[in-house]
Amino acid sequence: MNVTKSPAARLGVEQLETRNLLSNATLAVATGILNSPENYSDFVTSEYRHLLGRNPDSSGLSHFLGMLENGVSPETVEAQIVNSNEYVFDHGNTEVGWITGMYQDLLGRNPDANGLNNWLNALANGSSTFAVAAGLVTSQEREVSLIRSDYALYLGRAPRTDEIVSWLSQFQAGANRAQVAVGIVASNEFFALAGKDPSTFITHAYQDVFLRTPSQSEVNFWLSVYNQNQP
């Protein structure tokens, strides 16, 4: 089992650590779990089911897993999926149908007239379909939705306004959704919810991320990572 500690995975961590939100030990474990092949596979499968209404084929799964393992952001993977011929065809093979589908799938609502026209105008003025897809995937509305979902999943509560603003600033500085999730799972609050016990912290992380309980060997592995990153 490999532990991912790429510079990209630590983007924004220094600022968070100065506010006493993270420890190196919980950060190392959270980074490894959320950047694991298992989580990448779960993410791609979930995206296929949600956006394309099917499980990924082996070639598609392998393609996107390779991208994620090479440091491509989850946002880029999601944008590629909604920019695919399959997704466009599933939404009527028209610009209006395609944009409407992305609003519904990514933002949970129909497009307002201004929003729809803005994206149609962008296409008419030469923007690529990928640029439009990426624009919706990385929109502030989408990012706020992801922050709220992560807080509900990992902390069991809604984020405060100042917390939303703080995480949005991380997005604006270049963080992606996986890095934000790492910050939340590595937080003192998540650790406290797990009883401030490293083994329980690992178990809770597995249950929230993978929807399963870790094996004893997995707990032992991540305990060794945790202990290696203690001050």
Annotate each PLM feature.
Residues 1-25:
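Subset of Sec-pathway N-terminal targeting signals
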